[in-house]
Design a protein with these regions (language model features):
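Hydrophobic small-molecule pocket/channel-lining residues, especially in calycin-type beta-barrels
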Residues: 1-133
């Protein structure tokens, strides 16, 4: 299944998810500026039964690699990135289901007072697949 989110500046991305080996969730993201493909990312998610949370690894076509965990909080999925040493990164994404065909993603950054503040909010809608780049 794939979802597309667009921003006012013409940037968009298409995120597609499916199962892998009947046990993992595999995600791919294609980033666009207008119709031009500008980057790609892959990720794999698995459930850590001991910690009772989802862990993930992600990598990007520009060479970036990231790790983190996801938890369910008040009906939202909170994706918390981790720094290379394992500490919590000052940024996270919070996903909330809007309806059967869309979800809202708030990219947040920790403020000086310790609270989380939205930096960008994008609503993703279901699409058939990512367009060719």
């Amino acid at each position: 299944m794939c979802w597309r989110g667009s921003r006012p500046d013409g940037r968009s991305d298409v995120q597609c998810y499916g199962t892998q080996y009947g046990r993992f969730v595999r995600g791919t993201i294609k980033f666009y500026q207008g119709d031009k493909l500008t980057g790609e990312s892959d990720s794999v998610f698995s459930y850590d039964a001991n910690a009772r949370l989802i862990v993930y690894s992600q990598w990007v076509s520009n060479g970036g690699v990231g790790f983190g965990q996801a938890t369910l909080e008040n009906g939202e999925i909170v994706f918390q990135n981790r720094l290379p040493g394992g500490d919590e990164a000052p940024a996270r994404s919070v996903w909330r289901k809007v309806d059967a065909d869309s979800f809202r993603v708030a990219r947040q950054r920790r403020a000086d007072d310790g609270s989380w503040k939205d930096e960008q909010v994008v609503t993703y809608s279901r699409v058939a697949a990512a367009p060719k780049g």
